[in-house]
Amino acid sequence: MKSHLLHCQHITKYYQEGSQQTQVLKDVSFSMQAGELVAIVGSSGSGKSTLLHVLGGLDQPTSGEVFIQNQSLQKINANQLAQLRNQYLGFVYQFHHLMADFSALENVMMPMLIGKQNRSEAQDRAEKMLTAVGLSHRISHRPSALSGGERQRVAIARSLVNHPALVLADEPTGNLDRKTTESIFDLIKQLNQEQNIAFLLVTHDLTLAEKLSRRLVMQDGVLREEH
């Protein structure tokens, strides 16, 4: 198999609710290379978020296979999966999921501390990431003292602190105003170029998706390339 950063083949996903079975993903196959910036667009309920969860190993497909750096997520155990996610993947969500009692700096340090990394090294790297997202002056602030855009920048810094090869972002600007949304997208493009981090963004914002070099469209569980 050709070397891809991310590769999925024939992904199908069903959800069972009582006697009702719903197919959410229908034979999805696609690949991403290192450093790519890709958007998946589609209406609410089209299967975008489900696909992102499957690609990130947060949910299992009913059938099909996902490969990260040529390693199948379906052929490793839970500990190996957690290690692979920590090594290669970062996650950003519509809601920042920051811990309210911790400062911006402490929130960004958290993935490294969980990974048992040296505290002073974790602090140094977290400070650098907060500087990279334009928040060097806000590192001691708790989430409640930050704006919505600033909180999402902290979440992006946290997703990047372990130097992932790929960041999976689920509607990262979904609850932000237009000006803030555009600044977050500009930040993602800047980080992509400067650090060669690949981003896969799920969004329903077609205007922003058009700024990216590659777009995929999800409709009723079917993924197709937009040309």
Curated annotation (Swiss-Prot):
One Pfam match, given by its short name, reads ABC_tran
Keywords associated with the record? ATP-binding, Cell inner membrane, Cell membrane, Membrane, Nucleotide-binding, Translocase, Transport
**Which EC number(s) does the record attach to this protein?**
7.6.2.-
Domain ABC transporter: from-to ranges: 6-227
- UniProt-annotated location(s): Cell inner membrane
Chief location bin: membrane
Which terms in the Gene Ontology molecular function aspect does this entry carry?
ATP binding; ATP hydrolysis activity; transmembrane transporter activity
Broad class of enzyme this protein falls into = translocase
Q: How does it sit in the membrane?
A: Peripheral membrane protein
Q: Which InterPro entries match?
A: AAA+_ATPase, ABC_transporter-like_ATP-bd, ABC_transporter-like_CS, ABC_transpr_LolD-like, LolD_lipo_ATP-bd, MacB-like_ATP-bd, P-loop_NTPase
Matching entries from Gene3D superfamilies are given as: P-loop containing nucleotide triphosphate hydrolases
Enumerate the residues binding ATP.
Answer: 42-49
Q: GO terms for biological process?
A: lipoprotein localization to outer membrane; protein localization to outer membrane
Q: Which PROSITE patterns match?
A: ABC_TRANSPORTER_1, ABC_TRANSPORTER_2, LOLD
Record-level GO cellular component terms: plasma membrane
Q: Which family does it belong to?
A: Belongs to the ABC transporter superfamily. Lipoprotein translocase (TC 3.A.1.125) family.
Query: NCBIfam families per the record?
Result: LolD_lipo_ex
- Quaternary form? The complex is composed of two ATP-binding proteins (LolD) and two transmembrane proteins (LolC and LolE).
Described function = Part of the ABC transporter complex LolCDE involved in the translocation of mature outer membrane-directed lipoproteins, from the inner membrane to the periplasmic chaperone, LolA. Responsible for the formation of the LolA-lipoprotein complex in an ATP-dependent manner.
Q: What is this protein called?
A: Lipoprotein-releasing system ATP-binding protein LolD
Q: Which organism is it from?
A: Pasteurella multocida (strain Pm70)
Q: What is the lineage of its organism?
A: Bacteria, Pseudomonadati, Pseudomonadota, Gammaproteobacteria, Pasteurellales
